[in-house]
Every structure is written in structure tokens, then in C-alpha cells.
Amino acid sequence: MDSRPIGFLDSGVGGLTVVKEMFRQLPEEEVIFIGDQARAPYGPRPAQQIREFTWQMVNFLLTKNVKMIVIACNTATAVAWQEIKEKLDIPVLGVILPGASAAIKSTNLGKVGIIGTPMTVKSDAYRQKIQALSPNTAVVSLACPKFVPIVESNQMSSSLAKKVVYETLSPLVGKLDTLILGCTHYPLLRPIIQNVMGAEVKLIDSGAETVRDISVLLNYFEINHNWQNKHGGHHFYTTASPKGFKEIAEQWLSQEINVERIVL
């Protein structure tokens, strides 16, 4: 048993979609979350800069004595997960492999779509993982650079969001039966995405799939939280406005949280 918290990092608020699922599946675990909102979105940035920013968040989480780190950001996973995993002596999870595996199990037609940030799509990480596991699966990828700014500005239910999602995803409609939400921000737009793609298309939330892997690793390494130890509580950090982060986070997590601003 291990009562240390699990560390989560993201370029902004998107990683909260993973945290929400962890609260549901693993309510006994404690969370330290950092969102680098001041420098979001990561998708258009050069790979080396994304790697540098991700390491800054990792090093911050290590000062909090976390027992595991979850890179709850597809862009950071695509660019930095392998390197970080190899250099740390605690488990490090990314969100790409769990999403790819779930998509393969989901598709009946062998036609999978991936939507993500420009860097995630450019990295080709999802397609490589899917075709390594299922060579006959057809994969189409689409960058959606306007989605993250909509979420970060808390406009998920706006007419702008509906317009942008419709215009962006129209080329994919009718061409696949499974769509990976390849950015942890995108589940916050899920109702609109589902409406555009059609009810028959299965949406894969890579973050939710990742929580299943978290549970497996907690059991494997025997580092589940000890209920007998007093909780230290959850802690949330942002590099931007705590007020803006708190507003979106409480709306999404359906609970009050405390947020601190930090400088990396």
C-alpha cells in the first residue's frame, strides 16, 4: 500500500478529463495536477519546446513525492513520454497506447479516425501504434488546432464551438466507425463531436482508457492507496489564472477545488 499521490500533467485543463475518470474508477487515490495554461496550446509548438515544458512539469511533480506520473496530454505523450519513462524510476503513463488499443477493439469496419493537435497528428504516434497492433486497420488523421483554444476559453457550449467542430470534422463524416479523441481537451466537446459524426460512430476517450492502465499498474506494483492513512487531499496547480482554471475544473469535476498558480 502506498498513500503518495498520483501526478497528472497537461498543457491546460484537458487533463482534467482523465482526472474525472480516475475519481470515478479509483476514488481512494489522491491527485496532484498541473496544467500549463500560460503556454497552451502545445500542439503548434516545436517538439523540443514541448519536451522542455513537459520536463518542467515532471520535475515539479517529483517535488511533490508522487508515486506515478500520468502525462494526460496527447501532444506531450507523443513527444516526450518515451524519454521520461526511461529516465524515471516510478511508473510513467501516456495516453496514446491505451486509446489506440481501445480503438482496435471498437472498430467493426476496420476504419479508425484520429483527431488531435497538429503535433500529435504530425508525430504519427497513433497510426503507428494502431497499425503495429492491427496492420489491416485503415487510419485517417485530422489536426484540429481550433479545438483547444475553445476549451481553454470555456466556450464548449457556444455557437462558435458548434460551428468550428462542424467545419473541422465534416471531411470525416461517413468514412469511419470509430474516432479517437486524441487530445484530452476534446471530451469537453464530446456532445458536439458526437452530433457531427453521428450516433453510429464510437468515440474513444484516450484519457478514460488510460485510467484502466493506471489501475493495472497500481495493482502490479502494489502501490494502491492505503485507506487507513489520512488523505492529504487533491491539489491543483496552473501556470495561468487560478480563477479561470477553477471555473472550468469545478464545472467539469462537479466538486469544489483549490487551485494555486505556479511559475515553472
Swiss-Prot record:
MF GO annotations: glutamate racemase activity
PROSITE patterns assigned: ASP_GLU_RACEMASE_1, ASP_GLU_RACEMASE_2
Function: Provides the (R)-glutamate required for cell wall biosynthesis.
InterPro entries to which the protein is assigned, alphabetical: Asp/Glu/hydantoin_racemase (IPR015942), Asp/Glu_race (IPR001920), Asp/Glu_racemase_AS_1 (IPR018187), Asp/Glu_racemase_AS_2 (IPR033134), Glu_race (IPR004391)
PANTHER family per the UniProt record, alphabetical: GLUTAMATE RACEMASE (PTHR21198:SF2)
Active site: 73, 183
Protein name: Glutamate racemase
Principal EC category: isomerase
Disulfide topology: none
Enzyme Commission designation: 5.1.1.3
Binding positions for substrate per the UniProt entry: 10-11, 42-43, 74-75, 184-185
Entry coiled-coil feature ranges: none
